[in-house]
Amino acid sequence: MFMNRWLFSTNHKDIGTLYLLFGAWAGMVGTGLSLLIRAELGQPGTLIGDDQVYNVLVTAHAFVMIFFMVMPIMIGGFGNWLVPLMIGAPDMAFPRMNNMSFWLLPPSFLLLMASSMIEAGAGTGWTVYPPLAGNLAHAGASVDLTIFSLHLAGVSSILGAINFITTIINMKPPAMTQYQTPLFVWSVLVTAVLLLLSLPVLAAGITMLLTDRNLNTTFFDPAGGGDPILYQHLFWFFGHPEVYILILPGFGMISHIVTYYSGKKEPFGYMGMVWAMVSIGFLGFIVWAHHMFTVGMDVDTRAYFTSATMIIAIPTGVKVFSWLATLHGGNIKWSPALMWALGFIFLFTVGGLTGIVLANSSLDIVLHDTYYVVAHFHYVLSMGAVFAIMGGFVHWFPLFSGYTLNTTWAKIHFMIMFVGVNLTFFPQHFLGLSGMPRRYSDYPDAYTTWNTISSMGSFISLTAVMLMIFIIWEAFTSKREVLAVDLTSTNLEWLNGCPPPYHTFEEPAFVNPKWS
């Protein structure tokens, strides 16, 4: 029974739960790696003593957080749980493929961990640029294992993307049009399209790197007529859509949370929100070289990538102001989930502003590979994606479990986390503007103050993570069951009870078409 339910599952709710648990576990591994990084940088001088090991930590931290925490939780966890419920589908379109998508991740994670256990580990940074990732600078199997790990995670995501696209387009009730689906469903659809189009390019790039390393090809080796810059183009053609893949489901969740706790029955500017997400998805594919302003591109190429990058601020602004307009005049309920959403809107906007700074190629040439870039993307990830995940979790936890969280503890948790992440990452803007480079285990004494403060902030965030574990334990032991849910007519996922039955629909859902 246990094996049939959890190993061979074809149920979107169980698979979603598996994704959430796996993501939470990987998230703690990733947090541990980040704390080791911050411990090393907490004061001048060495702690770990080996710069290769330091770079392995940085590389693993990025891979674990991106591929094994944010994506499994947002797309696999919330996506699997909510998309079928929100469109009235009995399950996903391909339930067994859904199971395989999940079970490809633990082996992938194992390969990534194994890569750091053998030889010297993969100390390449998450970008895995040759020639550093070539077979001279990284002899041994570490980078090869990392590449295989990425292949598995990529196949998992591609299959998941096919599943979500098919489910969302094909499994709505006949009377429901695409423009009647909730914004979270739209966000998962756009995300799935991005995954489907970008991951094959990454697979091509890392496969070429694999053959360069093992089969004497020279795709990225100038000695044989190759070009290492080609790898950067292939990687970032995936890498930039990837960062939008990480944030788009968060946009969808924030739209739901803001609407719900404003007491509104719909978000402000539904169509604008949909097309903003589609625009962001499209533009995300034509700005990749802004990660490469320092490789020596023509001035006209840099002018194009600068302006194209800035255009993304427009649909993003549409979303931010629509969230604020949704809040306007609402009957605001100050729940923990809304606090996460408001924190998301503010801090994501700050991260977006530093992104506008970095979009200027002339400025980026100075700021590239400094802590200013680290501060920028951690504001949009550590305070964008993670705040969206936390907000979504405290909002939908009663749906998933049937139990309610202690709201006082949940609010305290938010406040500790808010202080922690800001104390960690705000000083890094100053470090970057003063020229402190990324991916170094040590630094001149002049940078000590801000690094010490940053490391203190990371330990405050650790306290918040541990408090969250306690809060979840408290909810499951106290067993406060859900009494009533507001606004179910426009929040269909709550309509079948908390938690919903194992099989939501024993017969096709009926949607009255009169409103369309």
Curated annotation (Swiss-Prot):
So what does this thing catalyse? Answer: 4 Fe(II)-[cytochrome c] + O2 + 8 H(+)(in) = 4 Fe(III)-[cytochrome c] + 2 H2O + 4 H(+)(out)
Q: Which GO terms describe its cellular component?
A: mitochondrial inner membrane; respiratory chain complex IV
Entry's localization field:
Mitochondrion inner membrane
| Entry keywords, A to Z | Calcium, Copper, Electron transport, Heme, Iron, Magnesium, Membrane, Metal-binding, Mitochondrion, Mitochondrion inner membrane, Respiratory chain, Sodium, Translocase, Transmembrane, Transmembrane helix, Transport
Natural source organism: Balaenoptera physalus
How does this protein lie in the membrane? Answer: Multi-pass membrane protein
What family is it from? Answer: Belongs to the heme-copper respiratory oxidase family.
The cofactor binding remark recorded in the entry reads: Binds 2 heme A groups non-covalently per subunit.
- The residues the record assigns to binding Na(+) are E40, G45, S441
Please state the pathway this protein functions in, per its UniProt record. Energy metabolism; oxidative phosphorylation
Sites binding heme a3 sit at H376
Question: What are the top taxonomic ranks of the organism?
Answer: Eukaryota, Metazoa, Chordata, Craniata, Vertebrata
Q: Which GO terms describe its biological process?
A: electron transport coupled proton transport; mitochondrial electron transport, cytochrome c to oxygen
What InterPro entries does the database record attribute to this sequence? Answer: Cyt_c_oxase-like_su1_dom, Cyt_c_oxase-like_su1_sf, Cyt_C_Oxase_1, Cyt_c_Oxase_su1_BS, Cyt_c_oxase_su1_dom
What name has this protein been given in UniProt? Answer: Cytochrome c oxidase subunit 1
List the gene name.
MT-CO1
Q: Cite the Gene3D superfamilies for this sequence.
A: Cytochrome c oxidase-like, subunit I domain (1.20.210.10)
Subunit and partners: Component of the cytochrome c oxidase (complex IV, CIV), a multisubunit enzyme composed of 14 subunits. The complex is composed of a catalytic core of 3 subunits MT-CO1, MT-CO2 and MT-CO3, encoded in the mitochondrial DNA, and 11 supernumerary subunits COX4I, COX5A, COX5B, COX6A, COX6B, COX6C, COX7A, COX7B, COX7C, COX8 and NDUFA4, which are encoded in the nuclear genome.
